[in-house]
């Protein structure tokens, strides 16, 4: 099973392009085949890093991945763009430009990263249970969630008066650097400023309500638009709907994990559904029409004369809407024979008379005989 691309690069879901590129450079250098000859594990990691970067560095692919996971980008990540030995289509100039960040000389090093306005909020994960009917058509759900919200007393600034001052340690950069000489040249270590936590500014007159954090626990209502065809384990990402960041930091994302409620009538198979129908022996022999429940209401189904037990009958277009593209799956009705446990004496006499008829005797079993239910299901669904 593929790992989450954000996990592969070691970044949060709210990471910007610069953070993603920086993480990619570091990992690509670590696992590059030139540095790890004849190392299959490193080669696999290198491929995985390139695949993750190709998706997360592309706005459209990242949007689809955030909404639908690996299913949203299909196999494009593994086969796109580059066409080289390791696939992916990543820009390898990103790897080699990283040397300017690590060693002195050359172009004089990378530009100083400016501190962000506050610390980004933490992503929030919730679980949303859906019925099969909701999944079949898609649904808009209004839900209440508890999360970190901006403090009303200080408007999220963390300061009682709203005043802040430039950090005296990093002078507003949000980071500190320490240079050291090695056999490869000058090595520069970059870390978040320990004084301001990477914000570049320090709060004055801390708010007594939020203790200077700028955020408090609250409850909000959000709307989630769920497309048709989602499956258990899929997730939707609502950008900026997660926890608010401390002291005006950008909010994190709300990750909605999809759960599918068990259905009392139907079993799901991809975008198709299966319904089991019990039919009397006379109706199987003579044929009949019956009302069959579907996800959209009851429909008439014809049971042909001579239908065998465990036959699968198809009702086109009564399954689940496709996640990508138009159309729906189908509903399959598995026909089983109903065997009553209690009979009147008259019923028993009729069955005894019927049993004497040679026309209802079962055919001799042979290698080419009737297929089992599992064989029929395999033929239908692959």
Swiss-Prot record:
Its main location: cytoplasm. InterPro entries: DnaJ, DnaJ_C, DnaJ_domain, DnaJ_domain_CS, HSP40/DnaJ_pept-bd, HSP_DnaJ_Cys-rich_dom, HSP_DnaJ_Cys-rich_dom_sf, J_dom_sf. The gene is dnaJ. Keywords: Chaperone, Cytoplasm, DNA replication, Metal-binding, Repeat, Stress response, Zinc, Zinc-finger. This is Chaperone protein DnaJ. One of its GO terms (molecular function) is heat shock protein binding. It comes from the Bacteria. Zn(2+) 2 binds at residues 167, 170, 193, 196. GO terms for biological process: chaperone cofactor-dependent protein refolding; DNA replication; protein refolding; response to heat. Belongs to the DnaJ family. The keyword Zinc-finger applies. Its cofactor is Zn(2+). PANTHER family: CHAPERONE PROTEIN DNAJ, DNAJ HOMOLOG 1, MITOCHONDRIAL-RELATED. One of its GO terms (cellular component) is cytoplasm.
């Amino acid at each position: 099973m593929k790992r989450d691309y954000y996990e592969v690069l070691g970044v949060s879901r709210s990471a910007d392009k610069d953070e993603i590129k920086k993480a990619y450079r570091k990992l690509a250098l670590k696992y590059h085949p030139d540095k790890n000859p004849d190392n299959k594990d490193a080669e696999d990691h290198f491929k995985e890093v390139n695949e993750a970067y190709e998706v997360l560095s592309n706005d459209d692919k990242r949007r689809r991945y955030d909404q639908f996971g690996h299913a949203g980008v299909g196999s494009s990540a593994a086969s796109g763009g580059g066409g080289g030995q390791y696939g992916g289509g990543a820009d390898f100039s990103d790897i080699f430009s990283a040397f300017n960040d690590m060693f002195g000389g050359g172009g004089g090093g990378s530009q100083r990263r400016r501190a962000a306005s506050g610390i980004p909020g933490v992503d929030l994960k919730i679980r949303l249970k859906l019925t099969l009917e909701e999944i079949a058509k898609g649904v808009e759900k209004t839900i209440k969630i508890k999360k970190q919200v901006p403090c009303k007393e200080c408007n999220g600034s963390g300061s009682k008066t709203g005043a802040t001052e430039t950090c005296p340690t990093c002078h507003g950069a949000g980071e500190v650097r320490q240079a050291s000489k090695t056999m490869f040249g000058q090595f520069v270590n970059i870390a978040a400023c320990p004084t301001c936590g990477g914000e570049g500014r320090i709060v004055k007159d801390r708010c007594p309500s939020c203790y200077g954090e700028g955020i408090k626990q609250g409850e909000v209502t959000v709307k989630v638009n769920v497309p048709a065809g989602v499956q258990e384990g899929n997730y939707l990402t609502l950008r900026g709907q997660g926890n608010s960041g401390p002291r005006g930091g950008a909010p994190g994302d709300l990750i909605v994990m999809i759960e599918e409620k068990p259905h009392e009538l139907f079993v799901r198979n991809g975008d198709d559904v299966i319904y089991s129908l019990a039919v009397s022996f006379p109706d199987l022999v003579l044929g009949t029409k019956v009302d069959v429940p579907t996800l959209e209401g009851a429909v008439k189904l014809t049971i042909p004369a001579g239908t065998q037990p465990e036959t699968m009958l198809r009702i086109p277009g009564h399954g689940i809407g496709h996640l990508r593209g138009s159309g729906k799956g189908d509903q399959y009705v598995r026909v089983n024979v109903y065997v009553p446990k209690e009979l009147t004496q008259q019923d028993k006499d009729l069955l005894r008379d019927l049993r004497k008829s040679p026309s209802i005797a079962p055919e001799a079993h042979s290698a080419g005989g009737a297929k089992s239910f599992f064989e029929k299901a395999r033929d239908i669904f692959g």
